[in-house]
């Protein structure tokens, strides 16, 4: 009986701790987030070689006019998107996914005066590790992806708040849906 009480006491303690963490979580950066971002990658995971292709495509040695023209291709349809598909050797949805991953890992800057260009982070990687061979480069890219609450909410939440020792799709989905409910996010997919 003493052992059962002890286990029960520990269980209650763990539940109370979890509730404190949950309350704290809702007072952290997630509390102020009004519009989470869960899409944009067209269901494609980040693939080997995509970031390198973007660094080559937006090579900083090119003239501004050429970069401006290339930047516009990413936001167009018809023949221009067909040119991009040929340049990258992928379909239309993959072109959009490549742009998404390059933006969210901060390889490209989408807010420059000329449209898209390599960010200072992208230029540094292109100069010192263009094929992403070094583990520290991959760690930095991972950190960039997981530290942007506004643009990659799932990654931010998973690596900063999700408290399970093992991650399953169902656990993560349920946890995100609970967060959506707690935060009263409207318009997020159920």
Q: Model-predicted segments: where are they?
A:
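Donor-sugar nucleotide-binding helix/loop cap in glycosyltransferases
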Residues: 24-190
